[in-house]
């Protein structure tokens, strides 16, 4: 093997090790049997959510995983291995690959890295069942809005009841101003009476 070839392979190992180090999740899958059209479709779905799919030789994967501190992954690198890397979304690679495997029997998840920790297939499958980040944010927003909406309805109901009962809803500031006005008038009246005496 020439020095140039060794240097190229070392550079490739460094690149893949950086992918592992810079990703919050990386899911390993067996892609044997996927058609070109299926592979293109899968790549497009992953790319839409900021996930990159790489098919890498097992020797390079093994060295790169060791360099990144994920040597426990080495048992997964048998047969043609593809890895879906995500730098931001912990759930997306597992969710998209799992969903795609439902329509493409040839795709098989093996394991990977979730939140920078080595994860077995059961863990990958649990994460795959979670909704997308956008859906989670929408659900969280709905949870926050629900109590606020209930409070607003309650305030409105109280106001409507007061109106129906013929009450005037004075604000505390108005009540205080009214009390101050009465108090000032009373003091002026007392002063006037004292002067007349």
Curated annotation (Swiss-Prot):
Segments for region (Disordered): 162-197
Gene Ontology BP terms: translation
SUPFAM superfamilies: Ribosomal protein L10-like (SSF160369)
Pfam families attached to this UniProt entry: Ribosomal_L10
Keywords, ordered alphabetically: Ribonucleoprotein, Ribosomal protein, RNA-binding, rRNA-binding
Molecular function per GO: large ribosomal subunit rRNA binding
GO CC annotations on file: ribonucleoprotein complex; ribosome
PANTHER family: 39S RIBOSOMAL PROTEIN L10, MITOCHONDRIAL
UniProt protein name: Large ribosomal subunit protein uL10
Organism this protein belongs to: Oenococcus oeni (strain ATCC BAA-331 / PSU-1)
Gene name of the record: rplJ
